[in-house]
Each structure stands twice: as structure tokens, then as C-alpha cells.
UniProtKB/Swiss-Prot annotation:
Pfam families: UPF0102. It comes from the Bacteria. Belongs to the UPF0102 family. This is UPF0102 protein HPG27_782.
Length: 114
């Protein structure tokens, strides 16, 4: 597990908070934030039109944050989603999304797996 300094963590939490506000404007209902399992964390779990969206928030100023979502990160997210469904309703439709925050702008990339 990686440990970050308080400044880095605070920046990430701020980006997640702003992301939730943005998602609400798109009609998403926040279900849960920062769901942890032994495999990793899901930043935001939101519901829209009966579909659960497991959303990874990435922010950055000097690089394209999408590159921080690696195949390894996606595998950890999938394992964490399985843990979530073992505790919650396993019959929900779902997708994995990325929300990119860069220079105060948001870009939602839905269903980033294939």
C-alpha cells in the first residue's frame, strides 16, 4: 500500500468532493464514497438510471491523469467491486468509470473496461 503525505491526500479528497458535485449535476445519486477492501478502494459509487457506477477519480495539472489508471489498477478495482457485491445486492447492473479532473475541468469516461 502506498502512503501519501497530508497535502497529497487533501488534494485528492478535494478533487473527489468536486467530482461528487459534478456528478450530481449529471443526475447521479451518490451511494457511497471511499469503499475499501483488502484489494483497494473505489472512490465513488453512484447510481444513475438503475446502473451502479464505480468511479475512479484522477486529478492532475502537469500530466494527463487518465494514465494513472493502469491495467493493474483496473484489476484491483474489479476485485474490490466483487467484495462490494458480496456485501450488497449482487444483481445490480454496473460499470466502471473514470472521472478526470484537470485544471478545474471535468471529463467523465464511462465504461472504461472492455
Amino acid at each position: 500500500m502506498r502512503f501519501f503525505n497530508n497535502k497529497h491526500r487533501a488534494k485528492g479528497l478535494k478533487a473527489e468532493e468536486e467530482a461528487c458535485g459534478f456528478l450530481k449535476t449529471l443526475g447521479f445519486e451518490m451511494v457511497e464514497r471511499n469503499f475499501f477492501s483488502q484489494f483497494g478502494e473505489i472512490d465513488i459509487i453512484a447510481l444513475k438510471k438503475g446502473v451502479l457506477h464505480f468511479i475512479e477519480v484522477k486529478s492532475g495539472e502537469n500530466f494527463d491523469p487518465i494514465y494513472a489508471i493502469t491495467p493493474s489498477k483496473l484489476k484491483k478495482m474489479i476485485k474490490t467491486i466483487r467484495c462490494y457485491f458480496s456485501q450488497k445486492d449482487p444483481n445490480s447492473d454496473f460499470c466502471i468509470d473514470a472521472l478526470i479532473v484537470k485544471n478545474g475541468k471535468f471529463e467523465l469516461l464511462e465504461n472504461i473496461t472492455f
